[in-house]
Amino acid sequence: MYQTTAALRSAFLEYFRTNGHQVVDSSSLVPANDPTLLFTNAGMNQFKDVFLGADKRSYSRATSSQRCVRAGGKHNDLDNVGYTARHHTFFEMLGNFSFGDYFKEEAIHFAWTFLTEELKLPKERLCVTIYETDDEAFEIWNKKIGVAAENIIRIGDNKGAAYASDNFWQMGDTGPCGPCSEIFYDHGDHIWGGRPGTPEEDGDRFIEIWNIVFMQYNRQADGEMKPLPKPSVDTGMGIERIAAIMQGVHSNYEIDIFQALIKKTAAILGVTDLENKSLRVIADHIRSCAFLIADGVMPSNEGRGYVLRRIIRRAVRHGNKLGATESFFYKLVPTLIEVMGDAAKGLQETQAIVEKSLKAEEEQFARTLERGLGILDAALNELTTKVLDGETAFKLYDTYGFPVDLTADVCREREITVDEAGFEAAMAEQRKRAQAAGQFDTDYNEGLKIDEQSSFTGYTELNNQATVTAIFKSGEAAETITAGDEAVIVLDNTPFYGESGGQSGDKGVLIADGIEFTVIDTQKYGQAIGHIGRVVTGEIKAGQSLTANVDKKLRHRTELNHSVTHLLHAALRQVLGAHVSQKGSLVDPERLRFDFSHFEGVKANELKEVEELVNTQIRRNHELTAEVMDIETAKEKGAMALFGEKYDSEVRVVTMGDFSIELCGGTHVGRTGDIGLFKITSEGGIAAGIRRIEAVTGAAAMAYVAKQQAQLEEAATLLKGDSASVVAKLKAQLDKTKQLEKELSQLKDKLAAATSADLAGEAVEVNGVKVLVKKLEGVDAGALRGLQDELKQKLQSGIVVLAIAGEDKVNLIVGVTKDLTGKVKAGELVASIAVQVGGKGGGRPDMAQAGGSQPENLDGALEQVIPWITAKLS
């Protein structure tokens, strides 16, 4: 019964559906509008605002199977993954929730009935914990459910403070909180461990499978616990743990999902030992990595992207340990989709981008992995203690891309720890250097808090009468402002659009008799719309009536650029694939900028196709419609939501014919034909997996095309042709240039040979070794390498040091014949010179190059060469 994890998931959701719960899809692994969380790590995350009373749903009971990641930040299981039976970076949390509906008795009954009747777990294998003073829960378990008193364990404040307990849950220092009750399963006395609350509780015999949280208090800032008017319930059960019980195994890695991934990995890498811990690591990591990419996270060097990169690189390192000689990680995605069943729907839709992203990241890391491992291995072999210094760990991170936890993982296998304090100190020094080189800007009204509300009228009008409800000057509330004052004015209603959703704020004026206030920007402050600007004439007071006039021309140009981003988004998805999602945008009167997810640069033919597709939709002159509807209806209509955005229960849906439908609160043109023309001006990468397109529309696009045409005609004139023959003429010119460069190179070689014959005679003897140190004039830097080769051949045995000085640049090269590299190494010698001329360099023992930025110090540096060589040869 329920022998697969997929069947168990379906049974859980169906059980609660038949008990009046709304089945809610798993939310993204990237929490919507919650800066406190790196990743979704519990089933209740998507319902947080419901529990806080800030969001209302059409249902009061819900159930879900939530994808979760714990890696990085406070909740970090990465170090233990693969080494224990139950630590994972990715897991699924089965849960049922009550928003002021049922409470303790029903919640306990639902859990017990599902476990003992639906799954038929033996009651004698189960015991429960409750908060020490929760007598109500004890009575329900004992009297209503029939659990013996000795199997109900009271857990008190075991974390050093009041209400700090394994059995008391709280969202934060203040807010909803309450006692919880946990259900434990006894795996049997053949496994070491004791019941909860005993000294042996950390063993693996008794495993928590279900946690039922009773939110019944609202914790105040002073610590007082006030009862909630409508108590709620939040529960969670890890699917991997209950699957292990149902499948008769002890370790989560023995369940069907992990076994399929372990066997597939072993088959790809030719591994026969299926108990190898590296196989466990890889099987776990493919789940978190694949689903994170499917949810829009791309490998990068910051934030969520860096956590993803760390997990991928850890998996790749374990693959390398198992003998992987080529990319393998991405090949596990089809197996993952197969074993995850219904939970893999989103992954299936993004399979291509997931596989390509994993493969690209693996190939990138493979270039430095072997060298980094070699350096780490050498450092570990030289250790006289059991601690690797932080400087070495930092070098591996900074130069070879080794996350510190990957270094720690390698060290752990040799029972060595990493000096993480030393690593952090080295990181801090790097940050200081970066900050010293950077500049930081401050927002004009950073931290401004406004309680007032404004109604936006700008969808249908660009001017209206309004009343001043608040004034802020220098960040403080003010009653009056006069000519010359800079301020933020809040109106009760306004046609001015406050910057949001990538659309810049409107400009314009606020006027009345004898009064003019120039609006240079409009921003949103909570529910208020703030008009930022300067008083030109008159005096403005709170409560005063003004006429708000938006600059019509600027608004119209902004609308052209905003509307076309919707067409661009749809066109990119059509040309590049459904994995494309918007990652950011900026639309103002001058241009538009659109950031989107894609694993490689957009090819020229693809850009051309996108541009043509957008212009086709412009010519079709679709009418734009904007409707307000509930979010579920919008999703059913296929409206695209922006990744990571949080939406109200009612949303505004903007539709452009049959081509584009998106959730959007911005302002737009009436018909796509109003846009006139769309022209892409640039495309490039801004982060790993994130591309950026910049473009112009309307008159700006026409001006851009006209400028390109003028440049084409100017090029034609220079090439003595017309615009139709430019390509052919340019190709012929390039071929001619290539031939001339080839001839020039041959002449330089001849010159170098001739020069070397003369220079070789200038060599001096140092302890029986011929040494040539020469500052060259009129020699191209590109000829240095060939020249030092010629000189070494002429000398047969000797050392050559050549230098060229420019206005603000120095080029150095050192050559050492191979019979002398045991005593003098070119890399060391060139480095000793380079440091004196403001540079650095290196290379092989027989040839090394360097550069510098202080030509004024070159003569003095060259004077030190002979003494340096003398010391080495003596």
From Swiss-Prot:
GO molecular function term, any single one: tRNA binding
Residues that coordinate or bind Zn(2+): 562, 566, 664, 668
Cofactor: Zn(2+)
Top EC class of this enzyme: ligase
Catalytic activity as recorded in UniProt: tRNA(Ala) + L-alanine + ATP = L-alanyl-tRNA(Ala) + AMP + diphosphate
Family matches, as InterPro entries: aa-tRNA-synth_II/BPL/LPL, Ala-tRNA-lgiase_IIc, Ala-tRNA-ligase_IIc_anticod-bd, Ala-tRNA-synth_IIc_core, Ala-tRNA-synth_IIc_N, Ala-tRNA_ligase, Ala_tRNA_ligase_euk/bac, DHHA1_dom
GO biological process: alanyl-tRNA aminoacylation; negative regulation of DNA-templated transcription
Co-factor note (free text): Binds 1 zinc ion per subunit.
Keywords: Aminoacyl-tRNA synthetase, ATP-binding, Cytoplasm, Ligase, Metal-binding, Nucleotide-binding, Protein biosynthesis, RNA-binding, tRNA-binding, Zinc
Enzyme nomenclature, EC number: 6.1.1.7
SUPFAM superfamilies registered for this protein in UniProt: Class II aaRS and biotin synthetases, Putative anticodon-binding domain of alanyl-tRNA synthetase (AlaRS), ThrRS/AlaRS common domain, Translation proteins
PANTHER family named in the record: ALANINE--TRNA LIGASE, CYTOPLASMIC, ALANYL-TRNA SYNTHETASE
Name used for this protein in its record: Alanine--tRNA ligase
Lineage: Bacteria, Pseudomonadati, Pseudomonadota, Gammaproteobacteria, Alteromonadales
